[in-house]
């Protein structure tokens, strides 16, 4: 499979109107990207894991990207969409990565019943990534 097809920004661009989006945070090597954009003219917040970086495993920094995406969606009262292709927790971050997943789950629970939460699973998704909405 082409790495272009796995790129989280490419996946976000395919989902949104006219591939027009704005990153919430500067892109790093954390394995997670978040952006705002429009789908059929409606504002959404989207986050996507990057399976080309450590198999999409989610660490501390990547978890914070998701939490920020949820905060942005809650603040704007718009849907949040997660694009998952993740190997679960980034074990190289140690026990702290498990705590970071807890922060993601807390953001999901806080948003429950308040904004729409949509998950797209586009590849293998293990551990915490499999427990999203």
Located regions from the model:
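Terminal-region recognition feature
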Residues: 1-118, 124, 129-130
